[in-house]
Amino acid sequence: MLFSSLTFVWFFLPALALIYYLAPGRKIKNAVLLIASLLFYSWGEPRYVALVLLSILFNYLFGLAIGKAGGRKGLRRAALAVCVGANLCLLGYFKYFNFFLELAYTVLGKEGFTPRNIALPIGISFYTFQAVSYIADIYRGVKPVQKHIFRLAMYISLFPQILSGPIVKYNELEPQIEGRRESISMHAYGIRRFVYGLAKKMVFANMFGQVVDRIWGLPLEQLGTAVVWFTILLYSLQIYYDFSG
């Protein structure tokens, strides 16, 4: 489910907003956001929701271990190294296993390399580095250990940034999970920002993208120097408005 899709704009977001504002108290509201985030993720990758939950549980337990280690630096460093290493190995397996396997075949002079069918889970880079940020912050003492697993789950899996980022440091987002301020003016500002971003994506980025695709589809002999430079300019604008939106 994309933020620019009709399903998100006309169904998911309005339903979430209604349920959120009807929910009493911060704990219930946070539970609504957490459930919505997992549903949002499962829309595109239902089989990998378990991987997100496993990542949350794993980093939660190692966070507790680092906290219980207290002043024992060696134990804290060992827990940090194992936790960060496991996170990066998981990410590396999905992203680079075939690359390193092919490299090994090449180095050993073997033939017949067949890539393994390993689907890359959506957003795994973002939620993995979010988890690493949490572990790094509590190791450095920037923030205390999060003893409430559901709050940590919100930080790692929050739907506005789990699919395409940005990666937000734990010490920046944690105060908003536990004690965020809300007002009509802030909600209105958020709606305006969302509408502006949606317009940049749907109107400008998509428009420039359609023109670029049509030009690149022309025969090579029809692509003069001026046309190529014009297309490069349009493509730059497409990328700008896509990321800006």
Briefly describe each language-model feature range.
Residues 1-244:
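Membrane-embedded transmembrane alpha-helical bundles that form the catalytic cores
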